């Protein structure tokens, strides 16, 4: 199994790509970051078995390309001030262009990167798309939920970077939200050591913290409010395969959000899966194998 990394030049920066591949694989998946973390924090995560989720996929016939878009993880350089889903998709399409040819290529987004694989699927860059904890809205939803949009706008300015850390993640998201919803932490015993290992090499890592573009986090509301589209013609998804997953106890992405995503793209060939016994962070929790198996089955079908 080959586990190298490389950079793809894009505008005034370099996109970091970490790949996990195996000889003879004819399928690939390009995995995107979450709100602030590298895709590696989710998929190149070893739950204590000695093998990461990405390595499981590679051993099953699926090469895995985990991409740090500009402003994330180990990427380098300057990002555009207006960091939106089209700019993000342009970066990923550049990575796809430089990849080896495969019989089937899928894209996987998580929560805040929901729109990006869908944009690329509509544009014809991908053969299928996977989104874990889908978070996507239209203009009507944004206008009907002013309190929510104001809360998000208050959480991030329109430019620059915001800083976070493992301590903030534990305090603000895990302890207060995910863990309280399910009653007790479900994370595997190796979680903290694995997360420390995966984040300490970030280009922006400093004193146990890292940064991510603020503008990108707001794309979920600024794009539909200013463009009145999802970033593509929904008709271009006709019959195309999409998998939406959600943790059974995912309080951060309610079931109604998944249902709404299915309604938006009802013309596509959509599959859904609820990951039993997990929260928003299923890949870190004891129920991780069901999540990995579901994604693997979809990518191989």
Which residues does each predicted region cover?
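N-terminal cap/lid segment of alpha/beta-hydrolase-fold proteins
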Residues: 1-24
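Conserved strand-to-loop "acid loop" that flanks and positions the catalytic carboxylate
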Residues: 243-249
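Alpha/beta-hydrolase
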Residues: 149-233, 240-243
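Catalytic histidine-centered segment of alpha/beta-hydrolase-like enzymes
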Residues: 278-289
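Glycine-rich "HGGG/HGxG" loop immediately N-terminal to the catalytic nucleophile
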Residues: 40, 67-83, 280
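Short, surface-exposed "cap/lid" segments of acyl-processing enzymes
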Residues: 24-60
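Conserved alpha/beta-hydrolase "acid-adjacent" motif
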Residues: 251-257
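Alpha/beta-hydrolase active-site loop
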Residues: 81-100
């Amino acid at each position: 199994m080959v586990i190298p990394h490389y950079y793809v030049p894009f505008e005034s920066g370099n996109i970091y790509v970490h790949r996990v591949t195996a000889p003879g694989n004819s399928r690939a998946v390009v995995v995107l970051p979450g709100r602030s973390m590298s895709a590696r924090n989710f998929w190149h995560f070893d739950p204590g078995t000695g093998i990461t989720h990405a390595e499981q996929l590679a051993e099953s016939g699926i090469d895995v390309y985990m991409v740090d878009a500009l402003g994330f993880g180990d990427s380098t350089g300057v990002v555009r001030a207006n960091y939106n889903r089209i700019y993000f998709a342009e970066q990923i399409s550049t990575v796809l262009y430089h990849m080896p040819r495969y019989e089937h290529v899928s894209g996987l987004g998580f929560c805040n990167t929901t729109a990006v694989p869908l944009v690329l699927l509509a544009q014809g860059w991908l053969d299928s798309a996977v989104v874990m904890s889908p978070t996507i809205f239209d203009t009507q939803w944004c206008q009907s939920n002013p309190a929510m949009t104001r809360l998000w706008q208050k959480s991030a300015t329109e430019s620059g970077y915001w800083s976070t850390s493992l301590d903030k993640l534990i305090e603000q998201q895990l302890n207060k939200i995910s863990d309280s919803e399910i009653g007790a932490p479900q994370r595997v015993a190796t979680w903290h050591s694995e997360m420390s290992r995966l984040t300490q090499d970030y280009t922006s890592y400093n004193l146990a913290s890292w940064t991510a573009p603020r503008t990108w986090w707001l794309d979920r509301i600024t794009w539909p409010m200013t463009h009145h589209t999802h970033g593509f013609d929904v008709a271009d998804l006709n019959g195309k395969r999409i998998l939406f997953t959600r943790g059974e106890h995912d309080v951060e992405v309610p079931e109604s959000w998944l249902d709404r995503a299915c309604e938006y793209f009802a013309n596509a060939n959509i599959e859904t899966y609820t990951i039993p016994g997990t929260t928003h962070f299923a890949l870190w929790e004891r129920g991780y194998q069901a999540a990995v198996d579901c994604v693997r089955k979809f990518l191989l079908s």
